[in-house]
């Protein structure tokens, strides 16, 4: 059989007509550097790269705008067809999967959506009638109703929780009568005014309980600072409210409550006298009110603060009931001094964050950190609270240069536009813009520090590098302390006429509309202060004791002579050669006249010789620097001074012939002798001072008069 099998094997090559099958190595060049790199790569690393490529494709599909638009259209269509159909839940799970992380930092469980009714059922509802922030407040209040139901504090829906959403109009939202706390959602809450009239019915046809709402309305009208009121009457709180001793400071929870007020409640607060008595009992700062033989009411400026006080008062009442039952009376209990321990308990708790705000960058309000933890619990159970978490739970990965990337202490918070339902896909698309806004609003300041560099061998290098560090000095922080503005009339003075405030506001708006440029508002404190102008740095005062000013050399000239002198100066500045030649000819004629007259020494008296000697000595003792500008002698100032002296000398004596020469720049000599002859060669001729033409005319006039 083996021989038959061996005979059946074909060992000849296939015929040439059979097509050649392409192999893997025929498509790859073994000398390709990319192929060599992949061949030398480890299998695990190659598998990781393949998984990254696959995830990249999925991410591109999920982040594509076309896929998002199609998914949003499908969700809107399913919501129009019916309430929570199966297709809508499936699409909602896909939307949650696309969102990489929910608000709390955890992904929502996919199978829990069908177990409970979601709290935030407003994405498809009409929210155009809601005021700013009402959508978020409705979600918070509905979540609080669910917490009260889970804690077992609900008493057949006879306990109520209300929240004021508008101080201007005093609008309050509350659950309607007949609706269980486990059914509370953001859409079925009823909005009423301060007197109980319905403003927004919500998604149900149920009415509110006016008797149960009356304590809430009385508290809101008495305390403008209160925003949330929680009223419960559980077994423990009702038992303590019937005790004459009230809430005893025997536990830490009772010390966290602060001052407690007590009021004899008769079942309603419709009468004006009862409201006045409640206002006297409640005071301006009390946060816990015990209704005698009825229950307990907790107040708060925020919903989180009110829950903080109602949780602690419920726990304190339970402790007190158990302690009295075990001890057999108040005398057997160790009662603490509240005033002694107030600084360690109530003051620390009232500062916010349960006492964890000490030097941290994240500032928590009273009860906020605990309330966020409970909201995360509800979200993980599938309640879909819609709560806007202030701080995420999961810590972000450290970035490059994270020592200066410190998150802002307080960021600007703005409510979203409630007129259009916000899709979770659009919310994720705006993540980058929100991250940018987060750092732009940071009030942190940094300082430049020079840090020595480290060399390769581990030693400290003399070179330094610049590092930015956060400024620890609180006085250098430019952001300041943020102030929460809840009331639009917060900065309006008390006892002001509202009509005047409205008129002033309208005037300011008109000024902004017409773009008027004014000096701004005038301060009432600085209006009567007279500010002296600072003295100028340069003060010019007349000094009577100082030396007299030099006389004006042109004071004795006429207007015609001044005009002629100005024209002469202009011709000199323009470089006209004719003017120079004319002046030289005038000087030559005057010098020749002087020479002809000085050649007869018998006509000069002895008195003139003495004057000549004095005049020559005075000129010889004076040094005149020679300045050359553009190749010419700039001797205008010297000429003016010499001309003055010559004119004075000519008026006091009968001297008519004076000759002044300059021999060298270092020394000026005047030679007044009859041997001076102007008939020498021009190259050896001594340079003479040229006198102005108006002086020559004066000399001619004097000669004629003489």
Curated annotation (Swiss-Prot):
Gene3D superfamilies: Class II aldolase/adducin N-terminal domain. Sumoylated. Proteolytically cleaved by asparagine endopeptidase (AEP) into 2 fragments. Overexpression of the 1-357 fragment induces neuronal apoptosis, and overexpression of either 1-357 or 358-706 fragment increases the degeneration of dendritic spines. Overexpression of the 1-357 fragment impairs neurite outgrowth by downregulating the expression of Rac2, and induces synaptic dysfunction and cognitive impairments in tau P301S transgenic mice, a mouse model for Alzheimer disease (AD). Residues 1-10 have a biased composition (Polar residues). The keyword Transmembrane helix does not apply. Its main location: cytoplasm. Residues 682-706 have a biased composition (Basic residues). Pfam families: Aldolase_II. It is a peripheral membrane protein. It comes from the Eukaryota. The modification N-acetylserine is found at residue 2. Residues 1-20, 471-497, 535-555, 575-610, 666-706 are annotated as: Disordered. Residues 684-701 are annotated as: Interaction with calmodulin. One of its GO terms (cellular component) is postsynaptic density. Residues 589-602 have a biased composition (Low complexity). SMART domains: Aldolase_II. Heterodimer of an alpha and a gamma subunit. Belongs to the aldolase class II family. Adducin subfamily. Membrane-cytoskeleton-associated protein that promotes the assembly of the spectrin-actin network. Plays a role in actin filament capping. Binds to calmodulin. Involved in myogenic reactivity of the renal afferent arteriole (Af-art), renal interlobular arteries and middle cerebral artery (MCA) to increased perfusion pressure. Involved in regulation of potassium channels in the vascular smooth muscle cells (VSMCs) of the Af-art and MCA ex vivo. It is linked to Cerebral palsy, spastic quadriplegic 3: A form of cerebral palsy, a group of non-progressive disorders of movement and/or posture resulting from defects in the developing central nervous system. CPSQ3 is an autosomal recessive neurodevelopmental disorder characterized by variable spasticity and cognitive impairment. This is Gamma-adducin. It comes from Homo sapiens (Human). The gene is ADD3.
